[in-house]
Design a protein with these regions (language model features):
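Extracytoplasmic/secreted proteins, especially bacterial periplasmic and envelope-associated proteins
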Residues: 57-67, 76, 80-91, 96, ...
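N-terminal capping segment at the start of a domain
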Residues: 36-82, 92, 301-318
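Secretory targeting signatures
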Residues: 1-46, 349-400
Length: 400
């Protein structure tokens, strides 16, 4: 699957979003969070003191993962990664299993670590990150590097690092539902994408779908300049709760944290970015899903997710323990306050149901990039998603 993003930012001065149709694409606007059930602020604030996530400990995992070498499906590094975390997670009491699939001539292996709950009837929450690193650095400015495998410190290891650190603390949270840590494979192998998550979704039973509270994806969450955008498609209630949690932790600009501190500009949910990522497969099954992702890794660069993305510059020094801590504490707070369970699937943002079927531009086709300074806008045709013929001025970037 080709990854792509269609970003609809809050319009800068001079930039007009033109709609040339008789109907408005509801999902093109930032999600409104006001109409959804809110968390109890006093409960959230009192829970912050219980948080145990250690960003420094998580960051140590980044160097270890990259040190294994390219974690390409079927490689020795991939197998060593699974063997090591299997031993570590089993020592903590997790039930660990692997499932191998054959896709497009590629053997991929998904790894699952389940923490059994105190109850057997309250369903499961899936926390996921891809552990494979990209097989080619095709966005590297140095042409001699473009055939080399990417180190994958941020785009691979960062999400895994957060899950592994959370794994240390989940057994002590006394949750009344199961937590499944899903380390998915073959998310980022040129020319195919999200194959591990796709295989997982295709093999779920109806009962497993119905008893899954939510699917929370962590992707590219270690950038020192952390900027988490509203990723579409996704569940609006989950997004609303993430903003509430982030506000309490001081991650939302213009707000005040539970500690009375001014919020940082980390959760930027006024900007919606369309990304065909692993979470789409859960979303399309009706499982409430959210993608926690930084879509700007390094210096902004047209048609990409930043100057370090899919290059040999995706190295451990670009990843910040502080950023990992911000994301890890956000997810931990959500776990401890039950923010990710008992979500209404019908609250998915209108118009996002079939985002994965939008035709993406083939490599080599021309794309325009809106310059924020000049207000240049791009007219992109959005087809096959129940709004045939609707044209919206948007920014189009391909994740290739």
């Amino acid at each position: 699957m080709r990854h792509a993003q269609v970003r609809v930012p809050t319009a800068p001065r001079g930039l007009m979003l033109a709609v040339l149709a008789s109907m408005v694409l509801a999902s093109s606007a930032p999600v409104s969070h006001a109409s959804f059930e809110e968390l109890e602020p006093s409960v959230v604030c009192s829970t912050i003191d219980e948080l145990q996530f250690n960003g420094t400990h998580a960051n140590a995992s980044i160097s270890w993962q990259v040190g294994l070498g390219p974690r390409i499906p079927g490689s020795n590094a991939s197998a060593e990664f699974r063997a090591t975390i299997t031993a570590d997670l089993e020592s903590l009491g997790y039930e660990v299993s692997n499932k191998t699939h054959e896709r497009y001539g590629m053997e991929l292996t998904n790894l699952f670590a389940r923490w059994p709950s105190d109850s057997t009837s309250n369903g499961q929450l899936v926390l996921s990150a891809h552990y494979d690193s990209r097989n080619v650095a095709d966005q590297d400015e140095n042409e001699s590097n473009q055939s080399l495998p990417v180190p994958g410190a941020n785009d691979a290891a960062s999400g895994v690092a957060v899950l592994l650190e959370l794994a240390r603390h989940i057994p002590h949270m006394n949750l009344d539902y199961d937590v499944v840590l899903f380390f998915n494979d073959a998310e980022d192998q040129q020319p195919k994408y999200t194959l591990g998550a796709e295989a997982w979704a295709e093999n779920l039973t109806g009962d497993e779908i119905n008893t899954t509270h939510a699917f929370v994806l962590l992707d590219m969450v270690g950038d020192a300049d952390l900027q988490l955008h509203d990723i579409a498609p996704g569940n609006a209630t989950l997004k609303s709760r993430v903003v509430e949690l982030g506000t309490s932790l001081g991650l939302v600009n213009g707000t005040t944290s539970c500690n009375g501190e001014a919020g940082l500009d980390v959760l930027q949910y006024e900007t919606t970015v369309y990304v065909l990522d692993d979470h789409v497969h859960a979303h399309n099954l009706g499982i409430p899903a959210i993608d926690l992702m930084d879509t700007s890794f390094g210096v902004p660069k047209p048609y990409t997710f930043g100057s370090y993305w899919h290059t040999m510059e995706d190295t451990p020094d670009k990843v910040s323990a502080q950023s990992l801590a911000k994301v890890g504490r956000l997810v931990e707070l959500g776990l401890r306050t039950d923010a990710f369970v008992n979500i209404n699937p019908s609250s998915d943002t209108t118009g996002e149901e079939d985002t994965s079927s939008v035709e993406q531009p083939e490599e080599g086709e021309s794309e325009a990039y809106p310059n924020q300074n000049t207000g240049l806008a791009v007219m992109a045709s959005v087809g096959l998603v129940s709004i045939l013929g609707l044209l919206v001025v948007v920014e189009v970037r391909g994740k290739r």
